[in-house]
Amino acid sequence: MEITSSAMLKPAPTPTPHPLAGEKVPLTAFDRAAFDVFVPMVFAYRAPAPSSEAVKEGLRMAVAAYPLAAGRLAVDVAADGQGRRRRRRVLHVNDEGALVLDATVEADLDAVLAANVATDLYPAPPEHSFGAAVLQVQLTRFRCSGLVVGLIVHHHVFDGHSTSAFCTTWARAVRDGEAFSVPSPCLDRAITSVPRSPPAPVFDHRSIEFKVGNKSSDSSGAAAAAVEKITNIGVRFTAKFVAELKARVGGRCSTFECVLAHAWKKMTAARGLKPEEFTRVRVAVNCRRRANPPAPADLFGNMVLWAFPRLQVRRLLSASYRDVVGAIRAAVARVDGEYIQSFVDYVEVADARGEELAATAAEPGETLCPDLEVDSWLGFRFHEMDLGTGPPAAVLSPDLPIEGLMILVPVGGDGGGVDLFVALADDRAQVFEQICYSLEEHAIPSHL
């Protein structure tokens, strides 16, 4: 791997400046609850792939349509409602641009696809997010003329829905070239966090999305763990396998629900947990349609909260797929308009009191056992990531530095297959690989 160039790519010029030019946009309640990390995505394209110049020009046009992607995270000092001067995190919309690296590899793309390893194929996340480009891209050319597009985006700026919208806009800009035109997305992030008057939180968000003060261990069992003791593995569930899971659930069931139910069962079994322990899954829920009133579908930013289906280990491992899916659905249903408004009100009250809120999201190197966290990319429109020569040949697994974190990715061309990428403790990963294709619903390890 050789990095051949590094440059800051400015947005393409527009006829009129966008309305947020130069603004310091405060992070919303949803931004502040999100991971304070860069999130990687890696797309592989077989030859013939578009030129790097075409990909970069498309990126310039996409960033012009999404100007927040060209900004920088910063700390600002402003007066609160009581007239007190307080530090706050902001996104400075300064058009400094996206960082773009060019790289070459003296190898064929097929070798990378066979290994499904994305190491070094996306920019290394900076140690500090303040002042760094919130969007960073690496274009890696292979000996066979294949191309890998690896990017990292900061989660305080992009949630998964926003990342999908941005990436598909970028691909369209590459395809359309000078003819590219796209309506501006909704950039008014503040509409997500309007409190009631007076604010009236009714749920205990301090134990769910936030902690007051510095982050510390919580009921999820998160504890420090050396990243080198975490193994990243990937397994593929074919469309036929997913159909069998759905048949076992019966009735209407989404791919996400049935695969999550299966993965929760098998990972819990692989971990060898005690029967009386409880295990839960942190499930990201897009709140755009669930809020009251709903937010625009094209809102660019964060608008995600989490559901927490929770079961005792003995019950989880003995339950039918139908029952486990029911527990997942019930937890997700609780993230409704009232819950979302309560969350917004809670942050407003905490800010008025001068409380420092720390997100409960896990940090790199932590272990979630006995719990899990799932991030679904099943709604990502990967087929629209066509840069003009066809959709990606593969979406490669990024490094997952948190034990118990899993990502669900649709399999291109499989008509319903799912790739599951998961990070598990070294001594548990092999066990999971041995049992992950078993469809025994009520199998309980002998020690339970």
Swiss-Prot record:
Documented EC number(s): 2.3.1.-
InterPro entries attached to this UniProt entry: CAT-like_dom_sf, Plant_Fungal_Acyltransferase
Residues of the signal peptide: none
Keywords for this protein: Acyltransferase, Transferase
Residues forming the catalytic site: 155 (proton acceptor), 386 (proton acceptor)
Broad EC category: transferase
Disordered: region residues: 1-20
MF GO annotations: acyltransferase activity, transferring groups other than amino-acyl groups; hydroxycinnamoyltransferase activity
Gene3D superfamilies: Chloramphenicol acetyltransferase-like domain (3.30.559.10)
Domain of life: Eukaryota
Stated role: Hydroxycinnamoyl transferase that catalyzes the transfer of an acyl from benzoyl-CoA to tryptamine, to produce benzoyl tryptamine. Serotonin and tyramine serve as acyl acceptors in vitro. Specific for benzoyl-CoA as acyl donor. Has no activity with p-coumaroyl-CoA, caffeoyl-CoA, or feruloyl-CoA as acyl donors.
Similarity comment: Belongs to the plant acyltransferase family.
Record PANTHER family: TRICHOTHECENE 3-O-ACETYLTRANSFERASE, TRYPTAMINE BENZOYLTRANSFERASE 2
Name recorded for this polypeptide: Tryptamine benzoyltransferase 2
Organism lineage string: Eukaryota, Viridiplantae, Streptophyta, Embryophyta, Tracheophyta
